[in-house]
């Protein structure tokens, strides 16, 4: 009877209290689930101290130990940063941080002569203050991750001055995009009538397509240097491969990622007949500034006292990453172009837009429910921006978790298909060696807990991909 009495008492609570309690309960349930998974994976890092027999041919014990220690440090950092984030979010909700920030935004607007009727203006001030708070509270964690963990394991290439300049630039660019887009979205919702959700969805669709189109040409160059890949054998072979699968390649760029990190990557962008490929310099063995630094440090005299410590130079050289040979770079690109040829990019866009439309439709259904606003401290007003925040971030959180897991499963399937496409191009052997090198260069740990990898990994574990490629190589 006691349990049923408690349940009856729960249902007799005001709707806003039930909603608030359910949001907090679900948030902590997800956090505890994530922590449980992380601890399972951490146990793997701690107990797997020797190279498993099946990895003996592809990874030496020194690299294995370095990757194990790197992932252990990342795991520890993730635990404490996750605990802080969950605690911070809970305290903000419990102590009315969202309505307080809304009232503070109203006061700032009042000082400038804007009354309560200027809701969109107040919403923009709210967004500015919220993103500023998020940036400031996240800064110590980002600093520690970059200058302690990444530095310790040889990945960080930034100075403190570069890091701070980069952070400020990112914040300013974000505001230049976020504030105008948000103001237009709020205006569309205000004037859209009964079918505002259709207009809001179409607007966000156009914005996302525009951002994808201009990102690499106008936004990314604000942070990194892009240079055309020099004429030569690699560029010729990339163009030949692109032509063989009818990929409408117009340009190939190399981005100077080495000034920020020694992690490597490659991607393509653009719509219709204007596709471009971007290679990180850290991916290219013959191009990487990091490899040139190795030669300089090992073949030149120390430039100053700080660099004069031979042990420091040895450690620096040891931590540099080798990148991939041209054949391996082509195999990696064959995999990436496989995503395009197999329609993965289009499928992901369609899924994203179907999800966006569904969310705006459900938002239209729920926005009139005053108890949703009351649950988060808004008893006398129902600002549109706050409605978006409450519904998209809190009310939709169970749906978002399920969708995220489904997309992770789909992503792994796409990765296997892209590997198979690279094999059809005759790149199985080179992709096999490239995956091993990239895993080594990025200190990826090749052993994973099955439940952790199932929930988190958007790419299949290394061993699974290698086994699939080995099977392909035999045919």
Swiss-Prot record:
Residue intervals on the Nuclear side: 40-81, 145-170, 217-347, 406-475
Similarity comment: family membership: Belongs to the peptidase M48A family.
Family matches, as PANTHER family: CAAX PRENYL PROTEASE 1 (PTHR10120)
Top enzyme category: hydrolase
Membrane topology according to the record: Multi-pass membrane protein
Cofactor note: Binds 1 zinc ion per subunit.
Residues that span the membrane, as ranges: 19-39, 82-102, 124-144, 171-191, 196-216, 348-368, 383-405
Impact reported for residue 248 to L: In MADB; does not affect enzyme activity
Residues the record lists as binding Zn(2+): 335, 339, 415
Lumenal side stretches: 1-18, 103-123, 192-195, 369-382
Role this protein plays: Transmembrane metalloprotease whose catalytic activity is critical for processing lamin A/LMNA on the inner nuclear membrane and clearing clogged translocons on the endoplasmic reticulum. Proteolytically removes the C-terminal three residues of farnesylated proteins. Also plays an antiviral role independently of its protease activity by restricting enveloped RNA and DNA viruses, including influenza A, Zika, Ebola, Sindbis, vesicular stomatitis, cowpox, and vaccinia.
GO molecular function, one term: double-stranded DNA binding
Disulfide bonds: none
Free-text tissue specificity from the UniProt record: Widely expressed. High levels in kidney, prostate, testis and ovary.
GO biological process: adult walking behavior; bone mineralization; CAAX-box protein processing; calcium ion import into sarcoplasmic reticulum; CAMKK-AMPK signaling cascade; cardiac conduction; cardiac muscle cell development; cardiac ventricle development
Species this protein is from: Homo sapiens
Swiss-Prot/TrEMBL domain comment: The metalloprotease domain is constituted by the two C-terminal nuclear regions.
UniProt disease link: Mandibuloacral dysplasia with type B lipodystrophy: A form of mandibuloacral dysplasia, a rare progeroid disorder with clinical and genetic heterogeneity, characterized by growth retardation, craniofacial dysmorphic features due to distal bone resorption, musculoskeletal and skin abnormalities associated with lipodystrophy. MADB is a disease characterized by mandibular and clavicular hypoplasia, acroosteolysis, delayed closure of the cranial suture, joint contractures, and generalized lipodystrophy with loss of subcutaneous fat from the extremities, face, neck and trunk.
Localization: Endoplasmic reticulum membrane; Nucleus inner membrane; Early endosome membrane; Late endosome membrane
Protein name per Swiss-Prot or TrEMBL: CAAX prenyl protease 1 homolog
Keywords, ordered alphabetically: Antiviral protein, Disease variant, Endoplasmic reticulum, Endosome, Hydrolase, Membrane, Metal-binding, Metalloprotease, Nucleus, Protease, Transmembrane, Transmembrane helix, Zinc
């Amino acid at each position: 009877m006691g349990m049923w009495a408690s349940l009856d008492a729960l249902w007799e609570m005001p709707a806003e209290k039930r909603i608030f309690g359910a949001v907090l309960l679900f948030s902590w349930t997800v956090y505890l689930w994530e922590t449980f998974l992380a601890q399972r994976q951490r146990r793997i890092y701690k107990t797997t101290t020797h190279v498993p027999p099946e990895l003996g041919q592809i990874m030496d014990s020194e690299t294995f130990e370095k990757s194990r220690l790197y992932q252990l440090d990342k795991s520890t950092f993730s635990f404490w940063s996750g605990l802080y984030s969950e605690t911070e979010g809970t305290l903000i909700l419990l102590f009315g941080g969202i309505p307080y920030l809304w009232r503070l935004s109203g006061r700032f607007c009042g000082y400038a002569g804007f009354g309560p009727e200027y809701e969109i203006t107040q919403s923009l001030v709210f967004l500015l203050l919220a993103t500023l708070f998020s940036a400031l509270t996240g800064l110590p964690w980002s600093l520690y991750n970059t200058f302690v963990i990444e530095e310790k394991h040889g990945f960080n290439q930034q100075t403190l001055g570069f890091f701070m300049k980069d952070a400020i630039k990112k914040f300013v660019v974000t505001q230049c995009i976020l504030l105008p887009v948000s103001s237009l979205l709020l205006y569309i919702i205000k004037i859209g009538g009964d079918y505002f959700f259709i207009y809001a969805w179409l607007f966000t669709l156009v914005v996302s397509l525009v951002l994808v189109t201009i990102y690499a040409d106008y936004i990314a160059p604000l942070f990194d240097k892009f240079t055309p890949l020099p004429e030569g054998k690699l560029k010729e072979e990339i163009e030949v491969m692109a032509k063989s699968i009818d990929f409408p390649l117009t340009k190939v760029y190399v981005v100077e990622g080495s000034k920020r990190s020694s992690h490597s990557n490659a991607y393509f962008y653009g719509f219709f007949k204007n596709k471009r490929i971007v290679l990180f310099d850290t991916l290219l063995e013959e191009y990487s500034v990091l490899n040139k630094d190795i030669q300089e440090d090992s073949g030149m005299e120390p430039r100053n006292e700080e660099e004069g410590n031979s042990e420091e130079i040895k450690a620096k050289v040891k931590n540099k990453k080798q990148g991939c040979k041209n054949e391996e770079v082509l195999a990696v690109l064959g995999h990436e172009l496989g995503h395009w040829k197999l329609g993965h990019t289009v499928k992901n866009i369609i899924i994203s837009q179907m999800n966006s439309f569904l969310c705006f439709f459900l938002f239209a259904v729920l926005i009139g429910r005053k108890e949703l606003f009351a649950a988060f401290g808004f008893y006398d007003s129902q600002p549109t921006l706050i409605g978006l925040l409450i519904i998209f971030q809190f009310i939709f959180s169970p749906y978002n978790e399920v969708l995220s897991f489904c997309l992770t499963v789909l992503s792994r399937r796409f990765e296997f298909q892209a590997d198979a496409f690279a094999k059809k191009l005759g790149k199985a052997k080179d992709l096999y060696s490239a995956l091993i090198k990239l895993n080594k260069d990025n200190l990826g740990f090749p052993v994973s807990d099955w439940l952790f990898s199932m929930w988190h990994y958007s790419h299949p574990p290394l061993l699974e991909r290698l086994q699939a490629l080995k099977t392909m190589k035999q045919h």
